[in-house]
Amino acid sequence: MPNVDDIRIFHGSANPSLAENVAKELNTTIGNALISRFSDGEIRFEIEENVRGRDIYLIQSTGHPTNEHVMELILMGDAFRRASAASITAVVPYFGYARQDRRVRSSRVPISAKVVADMMQKVGFSRLITVDLHADQIQGFFYMPVDNIYASITALEEYRLLDKLETPMIVSPDVGGVVRARAIAKRLNDSDLAIIDKRRPAPNQAEVMNVIGNVQNRHCVIVDDIVDTAGTLCHAASALKEKGALTVSSYCTHPVLSGNAVKNIMDSDIDELIVTDTIPLHEEAAKCRKITQISLSRLIAETISRINQKESVSSMFLD
């Protein structure tokens, strides 16, 4: 990848290893900055180099602890604006609060994704780069440009999962994920598609009801954007095995893996879970033999390079 001289890469505390790998792909280094905490827990951030007139790319996922990482992002953005950076691009591989993107019927709740978008714009971010945004329409909450990287296809192609399977079938874990699953199936050798029809009786609980499609003697690959408690995946895997699937693998971009997720995965019919490094794996997940993590550093670096060189980003994902 060509050297990009006029940009600077910085990061918060959410995912420094990903930021370092992105910088290496761009043949550059991480900018000098201090991020720490005051004695009362408030965030302290200071830029330790001249960034006047520079194009800043600030890499910061907003996963657990979500509120801490969101606040870091906001304060860092304000610091770069006050330091007269020419542009400030927020590179947020995992966009926290994305699942709170609408009011459900008459619920008296905030639209939290919109609140985060408003804060980012208020402090002066110029652009957002994110990965497999939970809902594409969240881009409409922003007045600034948003580049949503579609990582699923690239990640599965690089891992060559489908090449290892003789009769693969892409599976959507719910009706809402059909568009994503269909796009992946089309790009990956026009693989067949199955759908899990499920009902969710309570938050963070999923009950599989029906499998739409013949999965008998097939190697199934469930694709989703987020794996949180893993309830959806585990129920889906059981349903697929009951219908005669030979193996069940899964690809999920964002490994939130909260609560008993790792235990649920180990005790389930899932043979392998492939995730990316948009969120660092905690210790239990990193040791889990069923979980494989692949890096998106090259894809993110390519996106940054294209933006910097004023080249198309969308062409990376077109047939």
Swiss-Prot record:
Subunit structure and binding partners: Homohexamer.
Phylogenetic lineage: Bacteria, Pseudomonadati, Pseudomonadota, Gammaproteobacteria, Legionellales
CDD domains (alphabetical)? PRTases_typeI
Enumerate the cofactors the protein uses. Mg(2+)
* Binding positions (Mg(2+) 1): 134
Q: How is the cofactor bound?
A: Binds 2 Mg(2+) ions per subunit.
- Residue positions annotated to bind ATP are 40-42, 99-100
Q: What is the documented function of this protein? A: Involved in the biosynthesis of the central metabolite phospho-alpha-D-ribosyl-1-pyrophosphate (PRPP) via the transfer of pyrophosphoryl group from ATP to 1-hydroxyl of ribose-5-phosphate (Rib-5-P).
Q: What is its EC number?
A: 2.7.6.1
Name the catalysed reactions.
Answer: D-ribose 5-phosphate + ATP = 5-phospho-alpha-D-ribose 1-diphosphate + AMP + H(+)
Name of the encoding gene: prs
What this protein is called in its record is Ribose-phosphate pyrophosphokinase
Q: So where does Mg(2+) 2 get bound? A: 174
Q: Which UniProt keywords apply?
A: ATP-binding, Cytoplasm, Kinase, Magnesium, Metal-binding, Nucleotide biosynthesis, Nucleotide-binding, Transferase
Fetch the Gene3D superfamilies from UniProt.
3.40.50.2020
Biological processes per GO annotation: 5-phosphoribose 1-diphosphate biosynthetic process; purine nucleotide biosynthetic process; ribonucleoside monophosphate biosynthetic process
Q: Subcellular location, in the record's words? A: Cytoplasm
Q: Which GO terms describe its cellular component?
A: cytoplasm; ribose phosphate diphosphokinase complex
Species source reads Coxiella burnetii (strain RSA 493 / Nine Mile phase I)
Which residues constitute the catalytic centre?
198
The UniProt annotation places D-ribose 5-phosphate binding at: 200, 224, 228-232
